């Protein structure tokens, strides 16, 4: 019995077109995430892993869409193939079944290392671009989530003993952001 063909799509930004990744590829069902490849805790990836069954084939445009880190890529591929799920990477023309040859494992490692290297280059270019923009005065960073008045209110309520987790939720910020506001001088 042959299983389903399941597509996985990941885009990093909301302005990227997810449909083009598996254009012309027939799938029975598709899972799509809008998240960075560095994070493996992606809701639709986790749903796909739970959904896939023995005999199914997961189809992904390219390895870097599944993971940008070699260890994460290997782990995801191994998790799926150990359950009898096949994986196809369209761009690289590679398939993995769990009964792979040493050559197939080498290709996974090499191509995964390229994806990881590409991520490092992207981060480096981003840092350089931000540094240049700061020198020109064009980069100001992200806009603060709270106004000065709201930060003052937040501090007063923390000093009054209110729970920080509850306040973070009420103010619509993460706990880490709350702690950053408490650490910085106004």
UniProtKB/Swiss-Prot annotation:
Residues 4-137 form the Resolvase/invertase-type recombinase catalytic domain. Resolvase catalyzes the resolution (a site-specific recombination) of the cointegrated replicon to yield the final transposition products. SMART domains: Resolvase. GO terms for biological process: DNA integration. This is Transposon Tn21 resolvase. Belongs to the site-specific recombinase resolvase family. The active site is at residue 12. Transmembrane segments: none annotated.
């Amino acid at each position: 019995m042959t299983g389903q063909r399941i597509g996985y799509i990941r885009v990093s930004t909301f302005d990227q077109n997810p449909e083009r990744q598996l254009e012309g590829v027939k799938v029975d069902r598709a899972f799509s995430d809008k998240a960075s490849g560095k994070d493996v805790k992606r809701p639709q990836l986790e749903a796909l892993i739970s959904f896939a069954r023995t005999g199914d084939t997961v189809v992904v445009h390219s390895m870097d869409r599944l993971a940008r880190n070699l260890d994460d890529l290997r782990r995801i591929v191994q998790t799926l193939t150990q359950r009898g799920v096949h994986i196809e990477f369209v761009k690289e023309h590679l398939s993995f079944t769990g009964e792979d040859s040493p050559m197939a494992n080498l290709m996974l490692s090499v191509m995964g290392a390229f994806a990881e290297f590409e991520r490092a280059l992207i981060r480096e270019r981003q840092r350089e671009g931000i540094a240049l923009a700061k020198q020109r005065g064009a980069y100001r960073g992200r806009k603060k989530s709270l106004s000065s008045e709201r930060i003052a209110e937040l501090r007063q309520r923390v000093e009054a003993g209110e729970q920080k987790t509850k306040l973070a939720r009420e103010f619509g910020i993460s706990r880490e952001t709350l702690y950053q506001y408490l650490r910085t001088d106004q």
